A protein has these predicted regions:
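Short glycine-dipeptide loop
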Residues: 127, 163-167, 315-316
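A short helix->loop->beta-strand "cap" motif at the edges of active sites that frequently abuts
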Residues: 26, 161-166, 183-186, 347-348, ...
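ATP-dependent carboxylate-amine ligase catalytic core
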Residues: 18-24, 49-152, 241, 245, ...
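Nucleotide phosphate-binding/pyrophosphate-handling subdomain across enzymes
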Residues: 217-219, 230-349
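Extended acidic/charged loop-beta regions that coordinate divalent cations
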Residues: 94-104, 109-139, 177-233, 275-276
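Short acidic-hydrophobic, aromatic-tinged amphipathic segments that line or gate anion-handling sites
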Residues: 372-378
Length: 378
Protein backbone atom coordinates (compact mmCIF):
# COMPACT_ATOMS: atom_id res chain seq x y z
CA UNK A 1 0.00 0.00 0.00
CA UNK A 2 2.81 2.43 0.91
CA UNK A 3 4.51 1.77 -2.41
CA UNK A 4 1.29 2.45 -4.32
CA UNK A 5 0.71 5.69 -2.41
CA UNK A 6 4.28 6.80 -3.04
CA UNK A 7 3.94 6.12 -6.76
CA UNK A 8 0.69 8.10 -6.82
CA UNK A 9 2.27 11.06 -5.03
CA UNK A 10 5.31 11.03 -7.33
CA UNK A 11 3.02 10.91 -10.36
CA UNK A 12 1.00 13.91 -9.14
CA UNK A 13 3.93 16.15 -8.20
CA UNK A 14 5.78 15.21 -11.40
CA UNK A 15 2.70 16.18 -13.43
CA UNK A 16 2.52 19.46 -11.52
CA UNK A 17 6.24 20.09 -12.08
CA UNK A 18 5.83 19.56 -15.82
CA UNK A 19 2.98 22.07 -15.90
CA UNK A 20 5.01 24.56 -13.84
CA UNK A 21 7.90 24.34 -16.30
CA UNK A 22 5.49 24.85 -19.17
CA UNK A 23 3.88 27.88 -17.53
CA UNK A 24 6.93 29.72 -16.17
CA UNK A 25 9.59 28.57 -18.67
CA UNK A 26 12.64 28.88 -16.39
CA UNK A 27 16.12 28.16 -17.65
CA UNK A 28 17.65 25.03 -16.16
CA UNK A 29 21.21 24.08 -15.23
CA UNK A 30 21.43 20.32 -14.59
CA UNK A 31 24.37 18.81 -12.71
CA UNK A 32 25.17 15.12 -13.24
CA UNK A 33 28.12 12.83 -12.53
CA UNK A 34 29.38 10.40 -9.91
CA UNK A 35 31.44 12.76 -7.76
CA UNK A 36 30.98 16.35 -6.64
CA UNK A 37 27.41 17.03 -7.77
CA UNK A 38 26.23 18.77 -4.61
CA UNK A 39 29.38 20.89 -4.23
CA UNK A 40 29.16 21.88 -7.89
CA UNK A 41 25.44 22.64 -7.71
CA UNK A 42 25.96 24.87 -4.68
CA UNK A 43 28.89 26.73 -6.26
CA UNK A 44 26.87 27.34 -9.45
CA UNK A 45 24.01 28.71 -7.38
CA UNK A 46 26.40 31.07 -5.58
CA UNK A 47 27.66 32.44 -8.90
CA UNK A 48 24.38 32.96 -10.74
CA UNK A 49 22.03 33.85 -7.87
CA UNK A 50 23.61 37.30 -7.62
CA UNK A 51 22.47 38.04 -11.18
CA UNK A 52 19.28 36.03 -11.65
CA UNK A 53 16.40 34.92 -9.44
CA UNK A 54 17.58 31.35 -8.85
CA UNK A 55 16.44 28.23 -7.01
CA UNK A 56 18.58 25.15 -6.34
CA UNK A 57 18.05 21.58 -5.19
CA UNK A 58 18.26 21.38 -1.41
CA UNK A 59 21.13 19.45 0.18
CA UNK A 60 21.82 16.33 -1.91
CA UNK A 61 18.20 15.69 -2.89
CA UNK A 62 18.39 14.52 -6.49
CA UNK A 63 15.85 11.74 -7.14
CA UNK A 64 12.45 11.41 -8.80
CA UNK A 65 10.73 12.96 -5.77
CA UNK A 66 13.22 15.70 -4.97
CA UNK A 67 13.49 17.11 -8.49
CA UNK A 68 9.76 17.86 -8.93
CA UNK A 69 9.68 19.32 -5.41
CA UNK A 70 12.53 21.67 -6.29
CA UNK A 71 10.74 22.77 -9.45
CA UNK A 72 7.58 23.43 -7.42
CA UNK A 73 9.50 25.09 -4.57
CA UNK A 74 8.08 22.68 -2.00
CA UNK A 75 9.67 20.86 0.96
CA UNK A 76 10.06 17.12 1.27
CA UNK A 77 7.16 15.90 3.44
CA UNK A 78 8.91 12.59 4.12
CA UNK A 79 6.35 10.24 5.72
CA UNK A 80 3.74 12.87 6.65
CA UNK A 81 0.62 12.31 4.48
CA UNK A 82 -0.93 15.65 5.48
CA UNK A 83 2.15 17.56 4.32
CA UNK A 84 2.11 15.64 1.04
CA UNK A 85 -1.52 16.64 0.56
CA UNK A 86 -0.58 20.24 1.35
CA UNK A 87 2.28 20.04 -1.17
CA UNK A 88 -0.01 18.77 -3.91
CA UNK A 89 -2.52 21.57 -3.25
CA UNK A 90 0.23 24.20 -3.29
CA UNK A 91 1.52 22.72 -6.54
CA UNK A 92 -1.91 23.18 -8.11
CA UNK A 93 -2.09 26.77 -6.86
CA UNK A 94 1.33 27.49 -8.38
CA UNK A 95 0.00 26.35 -11.74
CA UNK A 96 -3.43 27.98 -11.49
CA UNK A 97 -2.40 31.38 -10.09
CA UNK A 98 0.49 33.62 -11.18
CA UNK A 99 3.51 33.52 -8.88
CA UNK A 100 6.96 35.09 -8.92
CA UNK A 101 9.00 32.20 -10.24
CA UNK A 102 12.80 31.75 -10.55
CA UNK A 103 14.53 32.63 -13.80
CA UNK A 104 17.00 29.77 -13.25
CA UNK A 105 16.74 26.37 -11.62
CA UNK A 106 19.96 24.59 -10.62
CA UNK A 107 19.06 20.92 -10.38
CA UNK A 108 21.23 18.11 -9.04
CA UNK A 109 20.21 14.94 -10.84
CA UNK A 110 21.30 11.54 -9.56
CA UNK A 111 21.00 7.93 -10.68
CA UNK A 112 21.14 4.93 -8.38
CA UNK A 113 19.66 2.49 -10.88
CA UNK A 114 19.44 2.11 -14.67
CA UNK A 115 16.76 4.33 -16.17
CA UNK A 116 16.68 6.93 -13.36
CA UNK A 117 18.06 9.86 -15.36
CA UNK A 118 16.76 8.68 -18.72
CA UNK A 119 13.23 8.89 -17.30
CA UNK A 120 13.80 12.43 -16.02
CA UNK A 121 15.44 13.56 -19.27
CA UNK A 122 12.19 12.86 -21.11
CA UNK A 123 10.53 15.88 -19.49
CA UNK A 124 13.37 18.16 -18.38
CA UNK A 125 15.20 20.00 -21.15
CA UNK A 126 18.13 21.88 -19.60
CA UNK A 127 19.87 24.94 -20.99
CA UNK A 128 23.15 23.97 -19.32
CA UNK A 129 24.38 20.50 -18.39
CA UNK A 130 27.41 20.08 -16.14
CA UNK A 131 29.11 16.68 -16.07
CA UNK A 132 31.41 16.53 -13.04
CA UNK A 133 33.49 13.36 -12.66
CA UNK A 134 33.08 9.62 -13.00
CA UNK A 135 36.47 8.35 -11.88
CA UNK A 136 37.89 4.92 -12.61
CA UNK A 137 35.24 3.12 -10.54
CA UNK A 138 32.07 5.23 -10.16
CA UNK A 139 29.70 4.83 -7.22
CA UNK A 140 26.50 2.81 -7.83
CA UNK A 141 28.36 0.63 -10.36
CA UNK A 142 26.99 -2.40 -8.48
CA UNK A 143 23.58 -1.79 -10.08
CA UNK A 144 24.77 -1.35 -13.67
CA UNK A 145 25.94 -4.00 -16.17
CA UNK A 146 29.13 -2.04 -16.87
CA UNK A 147 30.87 1.28 -16.25
CA UNK A 148 29.93 2.32 -19.78
CA UNK A 149 26.26 1.72 -19.00
CA UNK A 150 26.53 3.87 -15.89
CA UNK A 151 28.26 6.68 -17.80
CA UNK A 152 25.62 6.56 -20.53
CA UNK A 153 22.85 6.69 -17.93
CA UNK A 154 24.27 9.66 -16.06
CA UNK A 155 25.18 11.36 -19.31
CA UNK A 156 21.72 10.93 -20.82
CA UNK A 157 20.75 14.35 -19.47
CA UNK A 158 23.29 15.86 -21.88
CA UNK A 159 21.34 14.39 -24.78
CA UNK A 160 18.27 16.28 -23.53
CA UNK A 161 20.10 19.61 -23.76
CA UNK A 162 18.07 22.31 -25.50
CA UNK A 163 19.14 23.49 -28.93
CA UNK A 164 21.70 26.21 -28.36
CA UNK A 165 22.46 24.95 -24.86
CA UNK A 166 25.92 24.53 -23.36
CA UNK A 167 27.76 21.51 -21.97
CA UNK A 168 30.18 22.13 -19.10
CA UNK A 169 32.66 19.25 -19.01
CA UNK A 170 35.43 18.12 -16.68
CA UNK A 171 38.39 18.04 -19.06
CA UNK A 172 40.48 15.95 -16.65
CA UNK A 173 38.06 13.00 -16.59
CA UNK A 174 38.63 10.76 -19.61
CA UNK A 175 35.23 9.09 -19.28
CA UNK A 176 33.50 12.47 -19.37
CA UNK A 177 35.38 13.60 -22.46
CA UNK A 178 34.99 10.27 -24.26
CA UNK A 179 31.24 10.36 -23.65
CA UNK A 180 31.00 13.94 -24.90
CA UNK A 181 32.78 13.09 -28.17
CA UNK A 182 29.45 11.91 -29.58
CA UNK A 183 27.68 15.18 -28.70
CA UNK A 184 27.56 18.18 -31.01
CA UNK A 185 26.52 20.83 -28.48
CA UNK A 186 28.51 23.92 -27.61
CA UNK A 187 30.85 23.20 -24.72
CA UNK A 188 33.13 24.76 -22.15
CA UNK A 189 35.69 22.52 -20.47
CA UNK A 190 37.30 22.99 -17.08
CA UNK A 191 40.05 21.29 -15.11
CA UNK A 192 43.72 21.38 -14.23
CA UNK A 193 44.98 20.29 -17.65
CA UNK A 194 46.21 23.11 -19.93
CA UNK A 195 43.85 22.05 -22.71
CA UNK A 196 40.75 23.10 -20.76
CA UNK A 197 38.94 26.36 -21.46
CA UNK A 198 38.84 27.18 -17.75
CA UNK A 199 42.13 26.12 -16.19
CA UNK A 200 42.60 25.83 -12.42
CA UNK A 201 46.01 25.60 -10.82
CA UNK A 202 48.68 27.11 -8.59
CA UNK A 203 46.82 25.66 -5.64
CA UNK A 204 48.26 25.60 -2.15
CA UNK A 205 47.09 24.92 1.38
CA UNK A 206 46.85 27.98 3.61
CA UNK A 207 47.59 27.81 7.32
CA UNK A 208 46.47 29.74 10.38
CA UNK A 209 45.80 29.54 14.09
CA UNK A 210 42.45 28.54 15.54
CA UNK A 211 41.08 29.77 18.85
CA UNK A 212 42.73 28.31 21.95
CA UNK A 213 45.64 26.89 19.96
CA UNK A 214 49.16 28.18 19.50
CA UNK A 215 49.80 25.85 16.56
CA UNK A 216 49.24 26.49 12.88
CA UNK A 217 46.83 24.18 11.12
CA UNK A 218 45.33 24.12 7.61
CA UNK A 219 42.87 26.99 7.19
CA UNK A 220 41.80 26.57 3.58
CA UNK A 221 43.18 26.63 0.06
CA UNK A 222 44.17 29.25 -2.49
CA UNK A 223 44.31 28.72 -6.24
CA UNK A 224 43.98 30.54 -9.54
CA UNK A 225 41.60 30.18 -12.45
CA UNK A 226 42.87 31.14 -15.89
CA UNK A 227 40.37 31.95 -18.63
CA UNK A 228 40.51 34.02 -21.81
CA UNK A 229 43.83 35.60 -20.90
CA UNK A 230 42.79 36.50 -17.36
CA UNK A 231 44.14 34.93 -14.17
CA UNK A 232 41.76 35.18 -11.23
CA UNK A 233 42.81 34.35 -7.64
CA UNK A 234 40.35 32.38 -5.52
CA UNK A 235 40.55 31.84 -1.76
CA UNK A 236 38.57 29.20 0.13
CA UNK A 237 38.42 29.04 3.92
CA UNK A 238 36.96 26.37 6.13
CA UNK A 239 37.53 23.48 3.75
CA UNK A 240 40.47 21.83 2.08
CA UNK A 241 41.34 19.50 -0.76
CA UNK A 242 42.13 19.40 -4.42
CA UNK A 243 38.60 18.17 -5.12
CA UNK A 244 37.05 21.46 -3.98
CA UNK A 245 38.64 23.27 -6.88
CA UNK A 246 36.63 21.38 -9.51
CA UNK A 247 33.23 22.75 -8.34
CA UNK A 248 34.64 26.27 -8.32
CA UNK A 249 36.02 25.85 -11.83
CA UNK A 250 32.73 24.36 -13.05
CA UNK A 251 30.79 27.26 -11.52
CA UNK A 252 33.20 29.69 -13.17
CA UNK A 253 32.54 28.00 -16.52
CA UNK A 254 28.77 28.24 -16.03
CA UNK A 255 29.06 31.92 -15.12
CA UNK A 256 31.09 32.49 -18.27
CA UNK A 257 28.47 30.70 -20.37
CA UNK A 258 25.83 33.03 -18.91
CA UNK A 259 27.88 36.13 -19.70
CA UNK A 260 28.75 37.00 -16.11
CA UNK A 261 31.92 39.07 -15.69
CA UNK A 262 34.91 37.10 -14.40
CA UNK A 263 35.50 39.59 -11.58
CA UNK A 264 31.89 39.19 -10.42
CA UNK A 265 32.28 35.40 -10.57
CA UNK A 266 35.43 35.45 -8.45
CA UNK A 267 33.83 37.80 -5.90
CA UNK A 268 30.86 35.47 -5.57
CA UNK A 269 33.07 32.40 -5.16
CA UNK A 270 35.14 34.19 -2.51
CA UNK A 271 32.04 34.23 -0.30
CA UNK A 272 30.98 30.67 -1.11
CA UNK A 273 30.87 28.07 1.67
CA UNK A 274 31.14 24.39 0.59
CA UNK A 275 28.48 21.98 1.91
CA UNK A 276 28.93 20.10 5.16
CA UNK A 277 30.65 16.73 5.14
CA UNK A 278 32.92 17.58 2.23
CA UNK A 279 36.46 18.06 3.58
CA UNK A 280 35.28 20.73 6.02
CA UNK A 281 37.79 21.86 8.66
CA UNK A 282 36.60 21.48 12.26
CA UNK A 283 38.87 22.56 15.14
CA UNK A 284 39.08 19.82 17.77
CA UNK A 285 40.22 19.64 21.38
CA UNK A 286 43.84 19.33 22.54
CA UNK A 287 45.37 20.96 19.46
CA UNK A 288 43.67 18.73 16.91
CA UNK A 289 42.01 19.43 13.59
CA UNK A 290 39.25 17.24 12.13
CA UNK A 291 38.72 17.06 8.38
CA UNK A 292 35.06 16.13 7.97
CA UNK A 293 34.50 14.23 4.72
CA UNK A 294 31.71 12.06 6.08
CA UNK A 295 28.98 12.66 3.51
CA UNK A 296 29.80 9.67 1.33
CA UNK A 297 32.67 7.30 0.69
CA UNK A 298 33.81 6.45 -2.83
CA UNK A 299 37.16 5.56 -4.40
CA UNK A 300 37.67 9.06 -5.81
CA UNK A 301 36.68 10.76 -2.54
CA UNK A 302 38.94 8.57 -0.39
CA UNK A 303 41.89 8.94 -2.76
CA UNK A 304 41.54 12.72 -2.80
CA UNK A 305 41.15 12.82 0.97
CA UNK A 306 44.29 10.77 1.56
CA UNK A 307 46.26 12.88 -0.93
CA UNK A 308 45.20 15.99 0.94
CA UNK A 309 46.18 14.45 4.28
CA UNK A 310 49.55 13.54 2.78
CA UNK A 311 50.18 17.12 1.63
CA UNK A 312 49.37 18.77 4.95
CA UNK A 313 52.33 20.12 6.89
CA UNK A 314 51.33 19.98 10.54
CA UNK A 315 52.66 18.81 13.91
CA UNK A 316 51.53 15.59 15.46
CA UNK A 317 50.06 12.41 14.04
CA UNK A 318 47.99 12.01 10.92
CA UNK A 319 45.01 9.72 11.51
CA UNK A 320 42.56 8.42 8.91
CA UNK A 321 39.16 6.94 9.77
CA UNK A 322 37.84 5.10 6.72
CA UNK A 323 34.43 3.49 6.34
CA UNK A 324 32.99 1.09 3.79
CA UNK A 325 32.69 2.22 0.19
CA UNK A 326 29.28 0.97 -0.85
CA UNK A 327 27.71 -0.14 -4.13
CA UNK A 328 30.97 -1.00 -5.92
CA UNK A 329 29.96 -4.54 -6.87
CA UNK A 330 32.77 -6.65 -8.29
CA UNK A 331 35.24 -3.78 -7.79
CA UNK A 332 34.69 -3.58 -4.03
CA UNK A 333 37.56 -5.76 -2.78
CA UNK A 334 40.17 -4.31 -5.14
CA UNK A 335 39.20 -0.71 -4.36
CA UNK A 336 39.28 -1.27 -0.60
CA UNK A 337 42.71 -2.85 -0.99
CA UNK A 338 43.95 0.19 -2.91
CA UNK A 339 42.75 2.50 -0.15
CA UNK A 340 44.56 0.46 2.49
CA UNK A 341 47.80 0.48 0.52
CA UNK A 342 47.55 4.23 0.00
CA UNK A 343 46.70 4.93 3.64
CA UNK A 344 49.74 2.94 4.82
CA UNK A 345 51.99 5.53 3.17
CA UNK A 346 50.19 8.54 4.65
CA UNK A 347 49.00 7.92 8.22
CA UNK A 348 50.43 6.94 11.57
CA UNK A 349 47.10 5.53 12.71
CA UNK A 350 44.43 3.94 10.54
CA UNK A 351 40.93 3.28 11.86
CA UNK A 352 38.58 1.29 9.64
CA UNK A 353 34.84 0.88 10.18
CA UNK A 354 32.70 -1.74 8.46
CA UNK A 355 32.91 -5.29 7.16
CA UNK A 356 34.22 -4.26 3.73
CA UNK A 357 36.89 -2.13 5.35
CA UNK A 358 38.46 -5.22 6.87
CA UNK A 359 40.08 -5.52 3.45
CA UNK A 360 41.38 -1.94 3.81
CA UNK A 361 42.95 -2.75 7.18
CA UNK A 362 44.51 -5.99 5.90
CA UNK A 363 45.95 -4.25 2.84
CA UNK A 364 47.48 -1.51 5.00
CA UNK A 365 49.08 -4.17 7.21
CA UNK A 366 50.47 -6.00 4.18
CA UNK A 367 51.81 -2.70 2.83
CA UNK A 368 53.89 -2.11 5.95
CA UNK A 369 51.72 -0.28 8.48
CA UNK A 370 52.33 -1.87 11.87
CA UNK A 371 49.60 -3.89 13.56
CA UNK A 372 49.43 -1.53 16.55
CA UNK A 373 48.79 1.38 14.14
CA UNK A 374 45.56 -0.19 12.82
CA UNK A 375 42.21 -0.30 14.59
CA UNK A 376 39.35 -2.17 12.94
CA UNK A 377 35.66 -2.01 13.87
CA UNK A 378 32.74 -3.77 12.25
Amino acid sequence: MKKILKQAVVAVITWEAKLALRRYKPKIAAVVGSVGKTSTKDAIYTVISGHFFTRKSQKSFNNDIAIPLTILGLPNAWSNPFLWLKNMIEGLLLIALPHKYPEWLVLEIGADRPGDIEKISKWIRPDVVVITRFGDVPVHIEFFPSIEDLVNEKGSMARALKRGGTLILNHDDKRVMDFADSLLSSRITYGFSPGADVVAGHDRITYGMYDESDLEFPYGIEFRIDHAGNSIPISLQGAIGHQHIYPYAAAFAVGTALGINSVAISEALAAHIPPNGRMRLLPGVNDTLIIDDTYNSSPVAVQEGLKTLRDIVAPGRKIAILGDMMELGEYSKEEHQKMGEMASKVVRLLVTVGIRSRVTAAAALDAGLSDDAILQFD
